[in-house]
Amino acid sequence: MNTNTKTKATTAYPLVICGVFAAVMAVCSWIAIPLPSGVPINLAVLGVLLSAGCLGFKYGTLTQLVYVLLGCVGLPVFAGFNGGLHVIAGPTGGYIVGYILCAGIVGFIASRTKSFWALVGAMILGVLACYAFGTLWYVHLMDITFAVGLAQCVIPFLPFDAIKIALAALLVQRLRQTNLIKL
């Protein structure tokens, strides 16, 4: 293999992995249980945590940007097989955009430590940031109080997201130990 071919392969690998994780995000988003609030329970947060934990700040955040942009141009990657700017402009849009913030926080911390508990802490911070951004967005669009927004969009999801954090941290730790994903 000549040097030029090796360089192209090395450059392409992270982008391919980002594409794979963006596809994982879509599949995780499709597995959803609708709620009366309009914010469904789905596995998207698990996808965000896995991509950021495995890929770090740069590529974890890039993966979420790709995912959001694919949805914005109309591909049905969001919950309920939806896509388009109307989804981002709607009540759940803040949570979807918040995935980028979550990935940035988790990826930044995860790439700087090998500690399982630091990874769990990073994931908790990332999910809280996503909750904050998404809930502020929801409260603004729905013209409700922040307390009502928390009651509708955060509190019902806490047990599910705690499970997702635990599962993601365990999977990321295991993937790190096996060196399956190298960037």
List each model region and its residues.
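Short helix-perturbing small/polar motifs within transmembrane alpha-helices
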Residues: 2-5, 13, 18-20, 27, ...
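Generic alpha-helical transmembrane segments of integral inner-membrane proteins
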Residues: 19, 23, 27, 50, ...
